[in-house]
Amino acid sequence: MNSHVEQLKASIEPVRNTLLAHPVYSQIQDLQGLQRFSETHVFAVWDFMSLLKSLQIGLTSVALPWVPVGSADTRYLINEIVLGEESDVDEFDVRISHFELYIKAMQQMGASTTVIEALIAKLNAGLPVQEAIEAAALPKKVKDFLQFTFDISFN
């Protein structure tokens, strides 16, 4: 193998080992553990979709009239990621966002989607994102994580 690749693998090995030893893995020992994990992790999936949209708004042109903005390479990278995340494919070859696919997987395994669906419903009803997050039945750590993303995105 390429010596550069070997050096790169060696340099990230300590971080990789730290990640692999993360306590979350000990919590996922059975279906119930996976269900509990996904009921919280779905907010990280939604957060990523929102952060990605913030990057697309900030680094590409999404306004009318369209004008070129920033680096073409940056636009390509961001839009390629957006395409993949917003236009995934399910097991029936139907287009679906990665977020919606995650929700579908949660439902198939019997995990509750009540809290994330309630949050999305509040947003669809016009409640500002910070208020919708605050009103959600979520642990404080999850609320803080989400609020941090939107504080960055809006400021």
Q: Language model features by range: what are they?
A:
Residues 5, 71, 95:
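Flexible, glycine- and charge-enriched loops at secondary-structure boundaries
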Residues 1-16, 103, 112-117:
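Non-cleavable N-terminal signal-anchor transmembrane helices
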Residues 4-19, 29-67, 84-89, 140-147:
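Alpha-helical bundle segments that constitute or directly flank the non-heme di-iron/ferroxidase center
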Residues 70-76:
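Short, well-ordered alpha-helical segments
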Residues 76-155:
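Active-site-proximal alpha-helical scaffolds that flank and shape metal-associated catalytic sites
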